[in-house]
Amino acid sequence: MFGFPATTCCGDTPQDNSYEGSWAKFYAEHRLRFILGRSEKSNGPDKELGGLVNRTADEVVPRLLGDGHLGGEKGVVPVVIHGDLWSGNAGVGRLPSMKEGESEDVVFDPSAVYAHNEFELGIMKMVGFEREHWDGTCG
């Protein structure tokens, strides 16, 4: 199931983590349409924006993320992701169990959710993980 047993926040925005059996449905309803609803509540409706979000949720998401399109026979298998992983939520630190002078990469301020395993990559690229991070971590 895609979702999470508790509300988490992405920044200061609560996330609707209600469970869905389909990644496409979770993404369309609990990310795109949920954020549209929050925007309309705060700023009033925007007919053009609403139309674009709904069209994306109804037409684009099923084509790109729909069941049977990704993940082969198994489909998309939900994995726990951080949910808000960007350079401001990552650093180098020392955990209490570590010896003096030791440090390691740490991440914090999660917006955890069971999601598509590649969801995090889009967020990371959009908000500030640069090539140098990948060279140091994956290279």
Regions found by a protein language model. Name each.
Residues 6-65:
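Active-site catalytic-loop/activation-segment of kinase and kinase-like phosphoryl-transfer enzymes
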Residues 19-28, 35-37, 74-80, 87-139:
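Active-site Asp-x-Gly
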Residues 61-66, 70-71, 77:
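GST-like fold's C-terminal all-alpha helical module
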Residues 5, 13, 70, 90-95:
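Compositionally biased, intrinsically disordered low-complexity regions
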